Amino acid sequence: LTPMKIRILGCGGSFGSPLAWEKNGNIDINNPKNFRTRSSILIKINHQNLLIDTSPDLRIQLYQAKCTKIDAVLFTHQHSDHTAGLPDMRSMSLINKSIIPAYIPKEINESMINNYKFIFQGVKDYDPFMKAHILEDSFKIDDTEIKTFKHNHGSIDVQTYRINNFAYSTDLKNFYKNDIDKLKNLDLWIVGLLRYDPHPSHAGFEQILDYINYLKPKKTLFTHMTALLDYKELLSNCPQNVEPAYDGMEIQI
């Protein structure tokens, strides 16, 4: 299998961590691994940089990653903590003189284009800098094969992405039918864990551990974590080969 490097650009929930006001949940603010920007990852494979989601913190995330080129963006869903950084792709387009492809789930394709017309269609004096592609269950970006399917996130659906033996499932409440079996034989699974207790649109810690016990990936990382989850405490509660991610973490597969 083609080697890849995955960078955790951000692993926080929609508020980020710590919070923007006095109460910081349960985290130790002296531990830098508790400082989490909104969730997004960068995948380096086949000399390409693939981005999953464009968080509101994308500009600083890409700066810290020293990333000056994005070859494609894959979207999981339309919530603003996963899309609001989309305008930051303009600088990438200008630097590389390229139109950046965006792979968007069919049910949100039209609304994404309408919300960001200046990006996908252009406006007076400004050319479009991204091209929308409707997401398919299986597709290729050059030599990289990508598979995707929907999982439940409360009132909406979210895309799980799988590339070789790596998969990314943010904002997960539960899987449909037998779709979980599409995640067997993984070297790495990055999965959302908002908090310990179940949430109306997010699975709780015990349910995620049940999924991990069933799938048995070689390694699991938690993402999309609120300030209710302290890095050190959560790590102490994790079984072997399971741990919280942190911003800037890099994993080679």
Range-by-range predicted roles:
Residues 51-55, 71-81, 104-105, 166-172, ...:
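Active-site neighborhood of phospho(di)ester-bond hydrolases with catalytic His/Asp-centered motifs
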Residues 2-65, 131-178, 247-253:
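Core dinuclear metal-dependent hydrolase active-site scaffold
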Residues 68, 128, 144, 184, ...:
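Structured loop/turn residues at beta-strand edges in well-structured enzyme cores
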Residues 176-253:
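Binuclear metal-ion centers of metallo-dependent hydrolases, dominated by the metallo-beta-lactamase
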Residues 47-104, 186-188:
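Active-site metal-binding motif and surrounding structural segment of the metallo-beta-lactamase
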